[in-house]
């Protein structure tokens, strides 16, 4: 079960949001196509659908099994669906027991890199985050859009410091591109939006199928 969440987390490495007319805001409704690439592995496409601030992420799990996740910012929760198993899990990030970010202000620092760039025709602002370990992340973000990144569940994932997943969620800073580097400067992972389509999205895309079984997430082991 943990592997299923990890697979989706990797696919959502730095999920992005952009809009038609070279602009994006909280009212955007439509689909976004992006590609995530992990070092040594083939690029993996992912489709995201947005409606009323909610986000649905469709990707492939282990063995190519279909999976999707739905993030509801009003509840601060993510529902992870294993479609081939007709099962789902609910991750409530408003609870004190929710998984914590992988980095902290004590081990990383984030700052504006200066300047802007354009991703999929959308203007974004450059930020960089550096960790005391030597790792760094470069992101290009837009502001004012809901964000959630499941990489905060992935053990050992490089964080974004002051513009990390939790901080970005709170500040509504959404990355259109994210690139991770290790201490030697080698690229670890990359996510980038490739296409945007502004259109109506059916409400049923965010509804839990009636025949899906809810799975309970086992409690995390006690820390020594």
Language model segments and positions:
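Extended soluble regions of mature proteins
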Residues: 21-224
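C-terminal motif of bacterial Sec signal peptides marking the signal peptidase cleavage site
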Residues: 16-19
